[in-house]
């Protein structure tokens, strides 16, 4: 195996492991809610999680922007600047978190307007939100810290933080619900406790590995006007990009919901296949962020180009595996996700769309990692804006016959456009 392949796997595999823990945690929390004796608890758990996804989704730049800038500083051997990036990211995370806490009432109102749950679920979801929202400082700070570790070529520390929050969440929720008899609110309390325990663990890792550099750092220097403006410019592009991604996702769900419960269920299952593919591809993208950023910072163009080629080799291998699985075993996969024979049968009829997902999106995932590493965030924004425009035109203004196939045509085109535009931008500049 080539040295660059070992480097890619060294960073990618811990990231994939960390990603896998996310749905497992959701399943365990859902299982705890399911044992409380009322279906409304399950609904409230789902709605509460969705509310925070809507709130936090747009702040993914705290991880991505931090990762790229840190990797470049690492490549230059500039430890002082790498620490300064961390301080800027954590300062911005704290400011955003305080704003979320102060604006929690209008935020929960807006999120519930978008989701529109039943009155019983709404009341429980509100109670869940008003407890877990106090974890915003911990959640956003950990986004920045995990991005920083990734930029420092240390995805294992980022993985440990993710596993820590998941394990503590499960233990704390079980204790709060079944030992302390807190009921549904025990799940929210367990989540809140886990977030701050994981934040403490994150700080412990930072000082254990980089304590000397952190103690010598100057917050005033890190936050000086010119330095902060460059940091904010990178993150502003990613913020707008994330907002566009959220709009497409919400539109996809909304349009699918109008076609009836069966279509909504089918789309949800197929979207799980996209999410499953993304768990693997995110690992390769994270490796791209770290390694491309490192070689960009070191101004090593030859090694950078070699890294990009190998990222696409690994991405293509993952794509082929998923295409074979989705094309050859759709009934088996869908049967694992639901026992409803009608839903499985309907979902299998969309086999070609399932296969198209990895083909259309593979390059987009890889390019995202490359562009973040190079901090070419304006190019990422251009790709997503163009792709989003294509999605909305096909979905709402095309002569293509209405129905679920038009929706999937729009979504696959959106993924393919992201891949195509970023390919063009990279080839133009190299």
Regions found by a protein language model. Name each.
Residues 42-102, 139-158, 266-324, 328, ...:
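Small-residue-rich hydrophobic transmembrane alpha-helices
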Residues 162-169, 272-273, 385-394:
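Small-residue-enriched core segments of transmembrane alpha-helices in multipass membrane transport
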């Amino acid at each position: 195996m080539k040295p660059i392949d070992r480097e890619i796997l060294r960073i990618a595999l811990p990231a994939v492991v960390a990603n896998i823990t996310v749905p497992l945690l959701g399943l365990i929390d859902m299982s705890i809610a399911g044992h409380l004796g009322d279906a409304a608890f399950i609904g409230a758990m789902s709605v509460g999680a969705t509310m925070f996804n809507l709130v936090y989704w747009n702040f993914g730049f705290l991880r991505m922007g931090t990762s790229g800038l840190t990797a470049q500083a690492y490549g230059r051997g500039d430890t002082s600047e790498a620490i300064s990036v961390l301080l800027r990211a954590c300062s911005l995370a704290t400011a955003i978190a305080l704003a979320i806490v102060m604006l929690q009432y209008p935020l929960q109102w807006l999120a519930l307007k978008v989701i529109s749950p039943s009155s019983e679920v709404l009341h429980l979801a509100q109670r869940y939100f008003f407890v877990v929202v106090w974890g915003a400082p911990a959640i956003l700070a950990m986004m920045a810290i995990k991005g920083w570790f990734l930029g420092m070529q240390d995805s294992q520390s980022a993985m440990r933080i993710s596993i820590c929050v998941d394990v503590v969440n499960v233990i704390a929720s079980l204790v709060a619900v079944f030992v302390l008899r807190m009921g549904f609110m025990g799940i929210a309390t367990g989540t809140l406790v886990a977030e701050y325990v994981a934040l403490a663990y994150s700080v412990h890792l930072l000082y254990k590995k980089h304590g000397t550099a952190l103690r010598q750092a100057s917050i005033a220097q890190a936050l000086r006007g010119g330095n902060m403006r460059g940091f904010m410019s990178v993150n502003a592009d990613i913020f707008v990009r994330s907002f566009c991604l959220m709009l497409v996702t919400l539109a996809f769900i909304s349009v699918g919901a109008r076609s009836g419960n069966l279509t909504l269920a089918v789309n949800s299952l197929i979207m799980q296949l996209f999410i499953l593919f993304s768990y693997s591809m995110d690992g390769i993208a994270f490796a791209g962020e770290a390694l491309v950023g490192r070689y960009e910072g070191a101004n090593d163009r030859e090694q950078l180009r070699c890294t990009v080629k190998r990222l696409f080799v690994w991405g293509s291998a993952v794509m082929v595996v998923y295409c074979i699985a989705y094309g050859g075993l759709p009934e088996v996969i869908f049967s694992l996700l639901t026992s409803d024979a009608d839903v499985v049968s309907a979902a299998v009829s969309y086999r070609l769309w399932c296969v198209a997902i990895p083909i259309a999106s593979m390059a987009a995932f890889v390019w995202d990692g490359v562009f973040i590493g190079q901090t070419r965030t304006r190019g990422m924004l251009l790709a997503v804006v163009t792709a989003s425009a294509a999605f909305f035109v096909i979905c709402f203004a095309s002569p293509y016959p209405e129905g679920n196939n038009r929706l999937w045509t729009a979504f696959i085109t959106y993924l393919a456009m992201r891949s195509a535009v970023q390919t063009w931008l990279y080839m133009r500049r190299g």
